Amino acid sequence: MLCRTNVLHLRPQLNKFTYLTQFLWLCLFYITFYFVLYSVLVFTNTEWPFILLKKRLVSQEKIRAYQSNDCVGQTRGLTSEPSWRDACWRALILAYLTSIYFFPILGSFPRVLKDQVDFGYIPTVCILLYVIFLFFFDSYRKSLFTTALTHSFWL
């Protein structure tokens, strides 16, 4: 008859190397999964609603830039580069319209995840951060670039 200590002694014990290999396999699976997902979404002909919306906004921006470069637009003093206010408004509209598609996707998550995490603030925070970034960066972009060139920060 075997005693209890002998049974426990015969069980295989996992060492640190086993945990490391499990972690590496998990990372490899995770990276492969997201690479496949990215390649399916970007490099195929599938058109998701927010991708269509972004393409439509970008194409309208290109049309407006082309129309402002004609002779009539140049006499009025219009430039082809949109101001930061236009970029902020486009970002707000794009974020609002993509949030329409954002919440139904969250509705398909499991009930446990929806109860634990509140996703309602994410579009608002993204909009505010993007507007702040455009306000501070885009207005000083040209001056910073010319300053960097004149003071030769690139060397």
Curated annotation (Swiss-Prot):
What are the entry keywords? ATP synthesis, Membrane, Mitochondrion, Transmembrane, Transmembrane helix
Q: Which residues cross the membrane?
A: 23-43, 89-109, 117-137
Q: Which residues form the signal peptide?
A: none
Asked if the Swiss-Prot or TrEMBL record annotates the protein with the keyword Mitochondrion, the reply is: yes
Superkingdom of source: Eukaryota
Subcellular location per UniProt equals: Mitochondrion membrane
UniProt cross-references to InterPro entries, sorted A to Z:
YMF19-like_N
State a GO cellular component annotated for this protein.
mitochondrial membrane
Tell me the GO BP annotations in alphabetical order. Answer: ATP biosynthetic process
Q: How does it sit in the membrane?
A: Multi-pass membrane protein
Indicate the family of this protein: Belongs to the ATPase protein YMF19 family.
The name of this protein is Putative ATP synthase protein YMF19-like protein
